[in-house]
Regions:
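Bacterial N-terminal signal peptides that target proteins for export
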Residues: 1-8
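Short, linear, compositionally biased motifs with a strong N-terminal bias
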Residues: 10-13, 35
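N-terminal signal peptide c-region/cleavage motif recognized by signal peptidases
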Residues: 16-18
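N-terminal, motif-rich segments that launch catalysis or mediate targeting to/interaction with membranes
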Residues: 20-114, 126-254
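Hydrophobic, aromatic-enriched interface-forming segments
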Residues: 115-123
Length: 254
C-alpha cells in the first residue's frame, strides 16, 4: 500500500483528489471540523510541526489505506501495512519524547491519514463478509417492460467514497461544516471523554459495514431509496472521523 502524502498549503489553495477516503471537499471538511475542536495548545503544536494549520493540510493521493477485521468484526491485525497498525505506530511516535521533529511531523501526517481512512466504510475489510470490492446495481422504482428504468452500475467502495457526496455536488467544505455543526450539537463533550482507541474506531466502522451489507450485497439490484436510507451510516462515520482526529491530537500533542 502506498500511503497518502501530504502537503501543507494555503487554505484556499488546497491540493487534493477525489480518490481518498471521501471526496476532496469532504476530506477538507473533516480536517476543518476537527480543527474547530482542537485546544489552543494543540493548534499551536500542529502549526509548529507542519508550518501551517491543520485545516490547510492537503491530501495527494497515492492509494487508500485499508484495515482488516476478523469475521466477528474485531480488530486483531498485526499487518504492518494495515491502517490501524500504522496509526498506532504514529501515535507512539507522537507520544515519544525521543522522536525528532521530522519524525513527529511524519507521524502527524500519518495519523491524520489513517484516522480518516479507517472511518470510511470503503476502506473496511472483514474476513468472510467483506473481503473485496463488489458491483451493485441501483435503480428507481419505474420499470419499462421487464427492465428496470435507469439502472446504474456502481460498487461498494464507490458508494462510500462518492455516491452520497456527488448528490451534494455543489456543497463546499464550509457548507458541510454548517450542517455538521447542527447535526452534532452537544456531542463534543462525550467524544472528548473517550480514549484514543484506533481499534475500537475500526470496529465501529465494521459494525456500520455489517448494517449496510444487509442491503448492499454483491451484484444486488437495489432501489435508489434503499441506498439513500443508508446515508446516516456515512454521516455518522464523518462525525466520528472529525471528533476522533481532534481527540487524538489533543491527547498526543502535549
Amino acid at each position: 500500500m502506498k500511503s497518502l502524502r501530504y502537503i501543507a498549503v494555503a487554505l484556499f489553495a488546497l491540493v487534493a483528489t477525489d480518490a481518498m477516503a471521501w471526496t476532496s471537499e469532504v476530506n477538507r471538511a473533516v480536517v476543518m471540523f476537527a480543527e474547530e475542536h482542537l485546544s489552543k495548545r494543540t493548534k499551536s503544536g500542529v502549526e509548529q510541526l507542519l508550518g501551517a494549520p491543520l485545516s490547510s493540510v492537503g491530501f495527494v493521493n497515492e492509494g487508500k489505506s485499508k484495515t482488516r477485521l476478523d469475521e466477528s468484526g474485531k480488530s486483531v491485525t498485526t499487518d504492518e501495512k494495515d491502517a490501524v497498525v500504522l496509526l498506532e505506530k504514529a501515535i507512539a511516535t507522537l507520544e515519544s519524547e525521543s522522536a525528532t521533529a521530522e519524525e513527529r511531523k511524519s507521524a502527524l501526517l500519518t495519523a491524520i491519514d489513517m484516522t480518516v481512512d479507517i472511518h470510511c466504510l470503503a476502506n473496511i475489510l472483514i474476513d468472510k463478509h467483506l473481503e473485496k470490492n463488489f458491483a451493485i446495481f441501483c435503480h428507481n422504482s419505474m420499470q419499462i417492460g421487464f427492465r428496470y428504468y435507469a439502472k446504474k452500475k456502481t460498487n461498494w467502495q464507490r458508494v462510500w467514497h462518492k455516491e452520497y457526496h456527488t448528490s451534494h455536488g455543489a456543497f463546499s467544505a464550509e457548507m458541510y461544516l454548517y450542517d455538521w455543526r447542527i447535526a452534532t450539537k452537544g456531542m463534543a463533550k462525550a467524544y472528548k471523554a473517550e480514549p484514543v482507541a484506533p481499534r475500537k474506531w475500526a470496529e465501529q466502522s465494521a459494525k456500520r459495514a455489517f448494517v449496510a451489507l444487509g442491503t448492499l450485497q454483491p451484484n444486488a439490484v437495489v432501489e435508489n431509496a434503499e441506498v439513500a436510507r443508508l446515508e446516516y451510516l456515512n454521516d455518522a462515520s464523518l462525525y466520528d472521523a472529525s471528533f476522533h482526529l481532534a481527540n487524538l491530537l489533543n491527547k498526543t500533542l502535549k
